[in-house]
Every structure is written in C-alpha cells, then in structure tokens.
Amino acid sequence: MSKPKTPRSIAENEAQAIVSNLRVSPRKLNLVAQLIRNRKASDAVATLTFSKRRIAQAVKKALESAIANAENNHQLDVDRLVVSRAEVGRSIVMRRFHARGRGRAARVEKWFSHLKIVVAERSQETETKAEAA
C-alpha cells in the first residue's frame, strides 16, 4: 500500500530547479533573473557567465541544474530548451544590530531569497516561426 502519485506541478515538456536561502536580497536577485527570462538556455548560461554580479554564478549553477534535470530526468532536447520562468521569492531575514552613537543601536537586515528556474522545450513549429521572424 503506497501513497497515490501526486500530479506533476509543471507540464510534461518542462523541468525545474529550486534553490532555497540564497544570501542575497530578492531585489538584487531579480535583476539577475530578468537577464535570463524567456531566453534560450544556452544564451542564458553565456549571459550569466560574463555577468559582473556576485550572485550570477549561483543562478548559473541553478540553471545548469535545471538543464541537467530536463536532459536526464525528462529526456528533453537540450538544444530546444528555453527559460520559461525564473521566479524569485523572499526567504528569511537575518537581523543584526549595529552600534550607533549615544549607546543606541540600529537594526541591520540581511535578506535571503528563494529561486525557482523552469526550463521548457520549445515545439518545432514555434521554433520555425521564431526563426522566420
């Protein structure tokens, strides 16, 4: 007696990778995520490789994990993969105190983020329309 299978939360032509608790604010992580949304997976990896932002390497690692999941777990064609979604979410906020003048203290907030990257395989007819345009 096993539990019934839960339905997939993403489509059959998609694969995902999730990274929790990245030590960067969601606002800064979203700037990097905007660079790769709706781009070919190979172009997105190249963009992240040459990005000057510190968190770009962690995003690149997550993207490469999503590509590997698509290839190995779902048998999708790597050459036709597109970054369909790059979702950024808030995680915990670590609070520290910074000593100020007159014996006071100021709160310093260190934000953490979640990242979810979903890659999808483009269909043949969509690809030919994009090349024709």
Swiss-Prot record:
The organism sits in which domain of life?
A: Bacteria
Q: Which SUPFAM superfamilies match?
A: Ribosomal protein L22 (SSF54843)
Q: Give the InterPro entries listed for this entry.
A: Ribosomal_uL22 (IPR001063), Ribosomal_uL22_bac/chlpt-type (IPR005727), Ribosomal_uL22_bac/org-type (IPR047867), Ribosomal_uL22_CS (IPR018260), Ribosomal_uL22_sf (IPR036394)
What are the transmembrane regions? none
Q: Which CDD domains match?
A: Ribosomal_L22
Identify the Gene3D superfamilies for this entry: Ribosomal protein L22/L17
Q: Give the matching Pfam families.
A: Ribosomal_L22
Signal peptide stretch = none
Q: Name one GO cellular component term.
A: cytosolic large ribosomal subunit
Q: Give the GO biological process terms.
A: translation
User: Which UniProt key words apply to this protein?
Assistant: Ribonucleoprotein, Ribosomal protein, RNA-binding, rRNA-binding
The GO terms describing molecular function are: rRNA binding; structural constituent of ribosome
The family annotation for this protein states: Belongs to the universal ribosomal protein uL22 family.
Subunit and interaction comment? Part of the 50S ribosomal subunit.
User: What biological function has been recorded for the protein in this entry?
Assistant: This protein binds specifically to 23S rRNA; its binding is stimulated by other ribosomal proteins, e.g. L4, L17, and L20. It is important during the early stages of 50S assembly. It makes multiple contacts with different domains of the 23S rRNA in the assembled 50S subunit and ribosome. The globular domain of the protein is located near the polypeptide exit tunnel on the outside of the subunit, while an extended beta-hairpin is found that lines the wall of the exit tunnel in the center of the 70S ribosome.
> NCBIfam families per the record?
rplV_bact
Q: Under which name does UniProt file this protein?
A: Large ribosomal subunit protein uL22
Q: Which organism is it from?
A: Granulibacter bethesdensis (strain ATCC BAA-1260 / CGDNIH1)
Name the encoding gene, please: rplV
